[in-house]
Design a protein with these regions (language model features):
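Surface-exposed helix-capping loop/turn segments at secondary-structure junctions
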Residues: 66-77, 119-123
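GST-like domain detector, emphasizing the conserved glutathione-binding G-site
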Residues: 1-51, 141
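Acidic/histidine-enriched, glycine/proline-rich intrinsically disordered or flexible terminal extensions
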Residues: 127-142
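GST superfamily/GST-like fold recognition
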Residues: 26, 74-103, 114
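Extended, well-ordered alpha-helical scaffold segments
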Residues: 52-56, 103-116
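Residue-level signal for nonpolar/aromatic packing positions in well-ordered secondary structure
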Residues: 11, 64, 83, 114-117
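Amphipathic alpha-helical packing segments from all-alpha helical-bundle domains
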Residues: 50-67
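Short, structured loop/turn "capping" segments at alpha-beta junctions
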Residues: 22-26, 64, 71
Length: 142
């Protein structure tokens, strides 16, 4: 998590940001609506929720891009749990084709490095029930 207290604090801050803010504003509005709502038999996705989630995702994408303009990894100059958490959330959204990769080149480059790691290969082979993955999902060099 980093050697100095400020580095560890930044890792924790980013993790909390994903687990609270990103989860509430993006994941619940897109993934919960598109994937889990139908599986639970709760009807069709709410277009209002999807729209809100997509607007929020663009804001979060801009923040990730800003972070990576100033650092090598999400929380600093070292790979950390913050990168793993970020990659996990983005992976699901990427699977669904929701991420605007054409707008966020630094984030795309960072994510391609994560997708290329041997530990990420199994994730790229997973399937979300009957939902097909986006065309580029399994390709680390998308």
């Amino acid at each position: 998590m980093g050697k100095c207290p400020l580095s560890r604090l930044e890792v924790r801050r980013i993790c909390k940001w994903f687990d609270n803010k990103f989860n509430k504003e993006v994941y619940e509005n897109i993934v919960e609506e598109r994937v889990f709502k139908s599986l639970k038999g709760l009807g069709n996705p709410s277009s209002e929720s999807l729209k809100a989630g997509r607007v929020n995702l663009r804001n979060h994408e801009n923040y990730l891009e800003w972070l990576l303009k100033n650092r090598t990894f999400i929380a600093g100059e070292f790979f950390s749990i913050a990168d793993i958490i970020c990659a996990a959330y983005l992976s699901t959204l990427d699977y669904l084709g929701e991420v605007g990769w054409e707008r966020i080149n630094l984030t795309k480059k960072w994510y391609a490095q994560i997708k290329s790691r041997p530990s990420f290969r199994d994730i790229l082979e997973e399937k979300l029930f009957t939902i097909p993955a986006s065309k580029h999902y399994k390709n680390p060099d998308f």
